[in-house]
Amino acid sequence: TFGWQVEAEQVSLLPDVLSSLSAIIAVHTREGSPIIVPTPAYMPFLEIPGRNGRDCVEVPSVHGTQDGSPRWMLDLDGVESAMAAGAGLLVLCNPWNPVGRVLDTAELDAVAALSSAYGVPVFVDEIHAPLVLDEHLSHVPYASRPGADPDLTFTATAASKGWNIPGLKCAQLIASGRAR
C-alpha cells in the first residue's frame, strides 16, 4: 500500500491504465482543453488526448542533478505555464516511464500545489510502483501527499507490469472526493 490507505468504494475497475486515462479525459475535462504530458513519456500518453478531441501539450523535462548524479526532472515552470494557459489535465507517471525515476516528495508536493492553485486535475499512472530497483528509494503515491487534493486526483495502477500479467486486463482507477 506504500503507506496509502484506499477504501474499496474509491476503486473502479477498467481493462487497463490507458482506458482509465481515456475515461478521465472524456468525463473530467472540457472538449478542446489541452492535456499536459511531461516528456519523455510513454508514447500512448501522447496519442490518447487527440483520440479524445483534446490537444496534447508536451512539457519537456529538464536535466538536473541529485547528489552529483544527472537526472531527469519535471519542468515545473513549464507545467505551471500550461496550467495557467487553460490545460484541463496533467498526466503524471510515477515512477516515471520511460526514464525509470521515482519522483521525490518535493516534486510531488510541487505538482500538488500547482494542481490546487489552478484547479487542474492530475491523472497519475503508478503501474510501475512495485518496480523500484534502487534499495535506497521507495515509491511514494502522489495521492498520499498532504497537498494532493482528492477532488483533483486520479490514480491508475495494475498488476500487469509488476507481476507480468498484462493478459489479465484489470486495472484499478482510484478516485475520492468529488473526483468520484
Model-derived features: where do they sit?
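Active-site phosphate-binding strand-loop segment of PLP-dependent enzymes
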Residues: 62-137
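A short helix->loop->beta-strand "cap" motif at the edges of active sites that frequently abuts
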Residues: 33, 54, 117-121, 126, ...
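Aromatic/hydrophobic pocket-lining residues that form π-stacking "cages" and hydrophobic walls in ligand
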Residues: 45, 111, 142
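Phosphate-binding glycine-rich loop
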Residues: 1-34, 177
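Substrate-binding/gating loop at the entrance of the active-site cleft, primarily
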Residues: 15-26, 37-56
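Active-site PLP attachment segment
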Residues: 144-180
